[in-house]
Structure formats: C-alpha cells, structure tokens
C-alpha cells in the first residue's frame, strides 16, 4: 500500500503531486528544484548555488522521513544545459560520495520556475 508524504520543512510542491510516495521499503522522491523553502523562489547565484540548494532541499525532505542521502538507490538529474554537467557533478560528489547511487542525467529544454537543475531520487528505507 502506498503512503503519500508532503514536506513541512522543504519547499512546497508547485503542482498537484506528493513530495514523496512510499511503497514498502521504497521511497520515490519527486523532482526537487532549487527553491528556497522560505520563499518558494529559485535561489540566485548560478548553477553551483542551484545545485547546492537542490541537495540541501533533498536532505531536508529525506530527514523528515528518517532517511539520508545514503539511502539513495537511483538519482535522475535534469539539466537545462549540459555545459553545467561538470559543475553539478562536483556538488553531487560532495553530497553523495563515495558510495554513489546509480544515476541518469539528461538535458531538457525547460524546468519549472526557471530552474536550471532538478533531481529526483529512488531510496530504500533500511528500517521500519
């Protein structure tokens, strides 16, 4: 049976979707954009600032569910410009290393709210 989860500390959804859906021990985290949780606006400062905010947001939401980035099995990274690939990789490595989840990265024409990066995760609960 699935359980829908809505964050109370991370950025609010900008559409009709759950922050995450839990099914058994699997957690499907919706795509996270670099929105400031307090304002809902995309952070300024370029791709590094945006990628950092995405992973901070993910950490906040996972923490609400008793999880960490170590629970991640698969990440999907969406970029509006593949020229940002190296910069995002450097930040990604700081948050996930050295036991990286499986990952895909794709370039897309646009992301919600003018974001340059979005990340979704599939995680595994190790307890309960």
For the regions a language model picked out, list residue spans one by one.
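Short, polar/acidic, helix-capping and beta-turn segments at strand->helix junctions
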Residues: 2-128
């Amino acid at each position: 049976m699935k359980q829908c989860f809505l964050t109370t500390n991370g950025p609010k959804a900008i559409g009709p979707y759950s922050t995450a859906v839990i099914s058994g021990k699997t957690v499907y985290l919706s795509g996270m954009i670099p929105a400031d949780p307090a304002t809902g606006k995309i952070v300024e400062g370029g791709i590094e600032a945006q990628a950092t905010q995405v992973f901070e947001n993910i950490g906040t939401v996972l923490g609400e569910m008793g999880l960490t980035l170590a629970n991640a099995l698969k990440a999907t990274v969406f970029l509006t410009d593949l020229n940002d690939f190296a910069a995002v990789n450097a930040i990604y490595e700081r948050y996930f290393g050295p036991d990286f989840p499986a990952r895909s990265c794709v370039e897309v024409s646009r992301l919600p709210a003018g974001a340059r990066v979005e990340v979704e995760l599939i995680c595994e609960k190790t307890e309960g």
